[in-house]
Design a protein with these regions (language model features):
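Terminal transmembrane helical module of multi-pass membrane proteins
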Residues: 143-206
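N-terminal signal-anchor transmembrane alpha helix
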Residues: 9-45
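Interfacial helix-start motif at the membrane-water boundary
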Residues: 57-84
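Alpha-helical transmembrane segments of helical membrane proteins, especially in multi-pass transport
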Residues: 128-151
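Perimembrane loop-to-helix junctions flanking transmembrane segments
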Residues: 45-66, 204
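Alpha-helical transmembrane segments of multipass membrane proteins
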Residues: 25-33, 135-136, 180, 184, ...
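Cytosolic juxtamembrane amphipathic/interface segments immediately preceding
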Residues: 2-17, 158-166
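Conserved mixed alpha/beta catalytic, RNA-binding, or beta-rich assembly cores of soluble enzyme
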Residues: 95-118
């Protein structure tokens, strides 16, 4: 029984390679973001501290200027880029680069809170970035792995191969990823401000 379950969830070799490449790109971007955040010191570090303190003060007062559509677009734009790149040969290089950038901005933003507030910064960093990442990270990888494999096939095509038609599986996967990304945007709009407000009160009062 265990062997059957294991075989069912085992990925083909090409998918495992694609997953490893994208994971490495995302991790490399994340490590770079953390290192860059840790290097902020002197006047730059002071300005960063003032900025994040002011940001938490706005969060505590519930006056952060955030609209629904910009948040939804912020969550969807990376996914749309991955889906689009997967339809061209450029995706073979473009998708890993995009994963690296996404990992960099994610970790840099979170690490800045820890750089300024120490351990206390973990709480607002998780509420602001980590909570939605539980949704958009799976969506990104779910679109990225088949996307990079599709881009590889596009690279091998010849001019006389004809037009590629998108399969029903592609549309189902795209809809699932879009649902996760949009849910992350709604979570960031309705839930995150409440949790961030509570975290800001704890940090600024201590």
């Amino acid at each position: 029984m265990r062997l059957e379950i294991r075989k069912k969830w085992d990925l083909p070799l090409e998918q495992r390679i694609a997953l490893a490449v994208l994971s490495a790109a995302f991790l490399l971007g994340g490590v770079t973001g953390c290192l860059l955040a840790s290097l902020s010191s002197g006047a730059g570090g002071s300005e960063l501290g003032d900025y994040l303190t002011g940001y938490l003060e706005l969060a505590r007062e519930g006056t952060l200027p955030k609209g629904l559509w910009p948040l939804l677009w912020g969550q969807a734009k990376y996914l749309l880029a991955v889906l689009a790149l997967g339809l061209t040969a450029l995706g073979l290089a473009g998708i890993p680069i995009l994963f690296g950038l996404r990992g960099f901005f994610f970790s840099f933003s979170a690490a800045c809170f820890c750089r300024v507030f120490g351990r206390r910064g973990l709480l607002p960093a998780f509420f602001l970035f980590g909570l939605t990442a539980l949704l958009w990270v799976p969506a990104l990888f779910l679109a990225g792995v088949p996307g990079i494999l599709s881009a590889r096939k596009m690279l091998r095509r010849t001019p006389g191969d004809g037009v590629i038609s998108l399969s029903g599986a592609w549309w189902c996967r795209a809809a699932m990823c879009a649902g996760l990304a949009l849910t992350a945007g709604l979570l960031e709009y309705w839930v995150v401000p409440v949790l961030l407000r509570a975290a800001a009160r704890v940090i600024l009062s201590s």
